[in-house]
Amino acid sequence: MLVVDDESDLELLIKQKFRRKIREGSYEFFFAHNGAEAIQVLQKETNIDLVLSDINMPIMDGLTLLSKISELSPIIKVVMVSAYGDMDNIRIAMNRGAFDFVCKPVNFEDLEVTVEKTIQHVQQLRDTLQAIKENNILRMYVDENVLSFMNRREFESSLMANEVVEATVV
């Protein structure tokens, strides 16, 4: 997980709040102070799935970073964490692809729920992509006639007809 914020206090707070998950090895955090540093970290650390980013930062702001991340990888999800919680900034962030938005001052219970939800979403995306890859590999080896036969109702009925049901009457 990459945390992008120009306030160094947030790094300390994140490390304190998630220290148990860090010790367990469930979470690994990387930190950057602006969008440009974040891009460098993302190019170097290819296993990052989640970015927590502020909006207002020097060099490259969070909204610009959000646009650049979607160019890097469609899997990486961004949660904006910002004091700019007005509806305009929230709408801009969501329209540029933010997965969620958390307002500062950060409620860490809310942040933890948001992080868990985002990680689950990313895992579902990864599982779906893996299933698609496996299906594509299978399609290379299975004849089209077999696939069309398997999609017919007769095939499903024949499978059900051969099904053995065992039961015990008490």
Language model: regions and residue ranges:
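Two-component/phosphorelay signaling modules centered on CheY-like receiver
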Residues: 8-30
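Active-site beta3 strand of CheY-like receiver
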Residues: 46-52
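Short, conserved "switch-loop" micro-motifs in signal-transduction and mechanochemical regulators
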Residues: 84-85
